């Protein structure tokens, strides 16, 4: 009896050890809507539960809807310009810069900074990567806020991060190309949609309004196919 019990325990230990060393169990996940398990027809969800799910879906999805709607509208501009003389607009893959502080009458940005020159551009990174041009701002504060479709910031590019002047490559989530010589760094977006909002500090003086124009004219983005290693300017 003892021998049988010992054999049984040994076999159990061996089988348990083999299971522990084997690959972890993977559960297949649906990849299409039709593969999802659906509730039975007689199941009725409480109204409070349905409202809670709807609220969560709205909060989760609204940033993306907002981003895509803005991109579809703003990129209709035939060239970099200012809509209503206030809001930067530009074709897909390019950006437009202000040359002064943002005007109080604008409503596109809810809480804008009051001491920077703004810019704005939208991209389709599944079509082609985009070169982001960073001029030498000297001691001036600057930052390029870059966002994906979820409005998550996807890069640390600016004076607070010790970024160097030069060229940076913004690519989509599936891009596998070669990085050209002369590119300081590669920024990968988690979505094909991305946008950039440069901010360049400017003193509220006539002298600095004149001085900031030179670097602002070199704040540009353009498709990788147009990159030649030379700093461009408007």
PLM features per residue range, with description:
Residues 21-234:
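A compositional/structural signature for long, glycine/proline-rich flexible linkers
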Residues 1-22:
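Gram-negative bacterial Sec-dependent N-terminal signal peptides
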């Amino acid at each position: 009896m003892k021998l049988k019990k010992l054999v049984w325990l040994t076999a159990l230990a061996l089988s348990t050890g083999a299971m522990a060393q084997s690959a972890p169990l993977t559960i297949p996940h649906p990849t299409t809507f039709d593969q999802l398990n659906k509730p039975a027809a007689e199941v009725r969800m409480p109204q409070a539960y349905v409202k809670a799910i709807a609220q969560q879906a709205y909060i989760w999805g609204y940033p993306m809807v907002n981003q895509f709607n803005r991109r579809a509208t703003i990129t209709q501009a035939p060239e970099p310009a200012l809509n209503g003389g206030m809001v930067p607009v530009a074709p897909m893959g390019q950006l437009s810069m202000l040359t002064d502080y943002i005007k109080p009458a604008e409503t596109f940005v809810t809480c804008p900074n009051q001491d920077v020159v703004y810019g704005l551009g939208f991209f389709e990174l599944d079509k082609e990567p985009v070169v982001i041009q960073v001029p030498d701002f000297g001691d001036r504060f600057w930052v390029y806020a870059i966002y994906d479709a979820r409005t998550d910031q996807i890069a640390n590019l600016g004076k607070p991060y010790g970024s160097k002047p030069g060229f940076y490559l913004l690519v989509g989530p599936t891009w596998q190309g070669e990085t050209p010589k002369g590119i300081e760094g590669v920024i990968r977006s988690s979505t094909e949609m991305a946008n950039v909002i440069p901010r360049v500090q400017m003193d509220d003086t006539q002298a600095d309004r004149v001085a900031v124009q030179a670097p602002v004219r070199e704040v540009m983005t353009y498709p990788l196919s147009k990159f030649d290693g030379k700093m461009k300017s408007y």
